[in-house]
Amino acid sequence: EGERAAHAPMAMRQRAARFAEGNLAFERALHPALDHTVPPPAKTATFTWHIAPADGHFLGRVYSDGSRLDGPTPLLARNGWAFVVLDDDDHIIASASGVPPDWVEDIPGTEAWALTQAAMHALPLCTSFVDCDPCVKAVHAGPELSCADNKPLARVHRLMHLTLDDTPRQAVIWMPAHLRPGQCGAVTRGDGFLLTEPDISGNAEADKLAKRAVELHRVPLRTRQAIKAHDELVTANAMWIARASLIANQQCE
């Protein structure tokens, strides 16, 4: 934007803003696009127990999380989810992870999928801690609002509410993410209580497992590097053409 402000008139920048999104390589035919070199994300969802409860169900405090790596473009970004369950003695009694189906395309959707997977195995009286505020708000808003046809996450929210069933909304609590041990003293959760060290460790373990799950269908490093270099080259060429065109248009005939 700084380059545009220095070299292009305001009227031209306003016109260009309408077309700023997209793939320059494809839309401007500057270079052959490399999209075909990127393997697609996993089509179907996966579920893997790391610590499996004896009968497939658990009772405890649930920490669910979703992870998205290599974004922000959908071409490279891949999602993973996980949950960890602690008992009253703060021991991990259950944990699982996996990837969501390919129609779940963002972090709030992945977070909702993670909570759904945990709820499928949770016994009554479990409390869930989620570090995604939109996901928690969708739970508290209820199915009528969060599953409306005009909501982009209606499909995954509908599954989430069906699985939570009669779980009290106050049993799904927001908590801040990515804190370190020792930062609990002045930080509160969504229920007004102070964050605890087990809260931080439970969330951190879920985050680690979710990131590990992304590796199941992550785009290979060399492909990511090639796409990055290609995008930088195309952007540089597009900027050069824009500057040359501006200078040419300012010349007197």
Where do the protein language model's features map onto the residues?
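RNase H-like, metal-dependent ribonuclease domains
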Residues: 1-253
